[in-house]
From Swiss-Prot:
This is F-box protein At1g47810. SUPFAM superfamilies: F-box domain. Pfam families: F-box, FBA_3. PANTHER family: BNAA05G37150D PROTEIN-RELATED, F-BOX ASSOCIATED UBIQUITINATION EFFECTOR FAMILY PROTEIN-RELATED. It comes from Arabidopsis thaliana (Mouse-ear cress). InterPro entries: F-box-assoc_dom_typ3, F-box-assoc_interact_dom, F-box-like_dom_sf, F-box_dom. Disulfide bonds: none annotated. Residues 8-54 form the F-box domain.
Length: 351
């Protein structure tokens, strides 16, 4: 036994560049485990060069674009169980036998009834044990999902079902908006948090995920404002709607936050003829920020910001959902964004 241990210790360690290549060809769920094996392995996997190479390899090899579905099941109090699924956006797959597949949540079986296809592939699940209610819809940016429950913020990786809790703000501060963004140049995720206290109308703090000093830092905002809709991140820039007054009844503005320079500015005022029966939705429309308005009876309007300096918006079109589809979805539809092909993605408000 002693001879065996000595022979193992005498073996030359695997070169770092070889480990780098080995890890590149492994699934993400194994890498999540390997960070606990040794400090060297964790250092390689968390290295920014490795993260960029792994992301590029995954994108290149994944020839089929996929949609991510998230379903929640509230157990008790404010505890939520989240289930994540993915589905190819290519040619529809054949119908399946309803009893041939068992899913974690019975509500998922309604997917087949809605679209007439087999349900998506199960990815992972995660449980959120929180003390307060979630007032903001989760946001999805470059593979990560952000949740906000009162003053508690959670970032989840749906590919592996792992999540982390972000550091809390001061006890006297109330979060009124939290937005997740991704900077593709430096391969960094950042969270922009808007809060109010007795000392200020609206403060702005930023946190960089994965930084050695993972703490909130204050940034300056030249124009005080109150956040409105959820955000959209395009090429390292976060956009969200806001009002310069205390309520969202004031004229709406489009706020721009550059993740690289961490600068905030009012990018534009919403179009004069913009009207909506619900809060507007911001999406990435062919590389430009766009806003959707919802009318009644399944009609939607789309405005695209063509030139922020000239305050130039173009109204692309008015989209009408077929009455037959609306009749099957009495709970209504919401706009989630667009696919890589520029297709607008709608989803039921509730399943």
């Amino acid at each position: 036994m002693a001879d065996t241990e000595k022979s193992l210790q005498s073996l030359d360690p695997i070169p770092v560049d070889v480990l780098f290549e080995i890890f590149l060809n492994l699934p993400a769920k194994f890498l999540a485990r390997f960070v606990c094996v040794s400090k060297l392995w964790a250092k390689i996997i968390r290295n920014q060069d490795f993260i960029r190479s792994f992301s590029f390899r995954s994108f290149r090899e994944n020839k089929q674009h996929r949609l991510l579905f998230a379903f929640k099941n509230q157990i008790k109090g404010y505890q939520e169980n989240w289930y994540f699924f993915s589905k190819s956006t290519h040619v529809s797959t054949p119908l399946y036998e309803p009893n041939s597949l068992v899913l974690p949540d019975q509500n998922i079986n309604k997917f087949e009834a809605l679209v007439g296809e087999e349900p998506p592939d199960f990815e992972s699940s995660t449980v959120c044990h929180l003390k307060k209610m979630r007032y903001q819809n989760p946001s999805y940016v470059h593979g990560l999902i952000s949740f906000l429950y009162g003053e508690e913020q959670i970032i989840c990786n749906p590919s592996i079902g792992k999540s982390i809790n972000l550091p809390t703000l001061g006890s006297s501060e109330t979060i009124i908006g939290s937005f997740l963004g991704y900077d593709p140049i430096h391969a960094q995720y950042k969270v922009l948090c808007l809060n109010k206290s007795s000392l200020q109308f609206c403060g702005h703090q930023v946190l960089t995920l994965g930084a050695q000093n993972c703490s909130w830092r204050m940034i300056q905002c030249p124009t005080p404002h109150y956040p409105g809709t959820t955000s959209v991140c395009i090429d390292g820039v976060l956009y969200y709607s806001a009002s310069r007054g205390f309520t969202m009844h004031e004229p709406l503005n489009l706020v721009r936050f550059d993740l690289r320079t961490e600068s905030l500015e009012i990018a534009s005022v919403f179009p004069e003829d913009f009207k909506s029966s619900v809060k507007p939705s911001l999406i990435n429309y062919r590389g430009k920020v766009a806003v959707f308005s919802k009318y009644f009876c399944g009609d939607f309007g789309l405005w695209v910001l063509e030139d922020a300096k000239k305050q130039q918006w173009s109204k692309e079109q008015r989209i009408s959902i077929r009455r037959g589809v609306i009749g099957r979805l009495p709970q209504g539809l919401q706009i989630l964004g667009t696919s890589d092909m520029g297709e607008v993605i709608f989803a039921p408000n509730y399943f």
